[in-house]
Amino acid sequence: MTVSLKKGQKVDLTKGNSGISKVIVGLGWDEKKSGKGGLFGAMFGKKGADIDCDASAIMCTNGKCISAEDVVYFGNLRHKSGAVTHMGDNLTGAGEGDDEQIVVDLTRVPQQYDRIVIVVNIYQAVARHQDFGMIQNAFIRIVDCRNNTEMCKFNLSENYDGMYAMVFGELYRHDGEWKFNAIGQGTQDPGL
C-alpha cells in the first residue's frame, strides 16, 4: 500500500519490511505546455528548447558531500561502492511514469554515508531561461525492488517559479534503519 506524503513527512522504509534491500527511486515530471514559444512560435513552428531535467543522488557523510565521486548522475552512473546506480538520462521528460530512476541497494551503502539526497536540476537552466515554474506533475516515489510495490510517493505541488534545481527528497539512515524524507525544496543554484 502506497503512503502518500506531504512536504516534510517521513516514512520508515526498512523497519517492518524484513528482507528489503533494494529500492528504486522513481522521479517524474512534465513540461507545462502553455506559453512555450509564444504566438509567433505557435504560428511559425518555433519554440524554446525542451526542458531537460536531470536527477542525481548525492551520497552524504554527516550531511555533507565529501567528494565529486559521491554524486551519481548521468555523467557518473554508478557509485564506487556499487550501492547507487542511475538508470540513465531522459532528455525530455515525455511519457507516463518515471522519467528517471535511481536504484539504491540499502545493504551496500557504506557506513560512512548517512544520507542520499535526491536532487533534480534543469540542464542549462539559466542559458535557456528555464525554471521549475515551467514544470508540472513532478513526483518522487520509492519502490520495493522485491515485488515492484510502490512504498511511498511525494507529489511536488508548490509553485517553484525561478528555481533551477530541486531537492525532491532524501533517503537517510537513523538507528540502523533507512527512512525517506519528502523535502520539495527549490534553489536558484544552477550548479546543484
Label every model-predicted segment.
Residues 1-115, 119-192:
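Intrinsic-disorder/low-complexity signal
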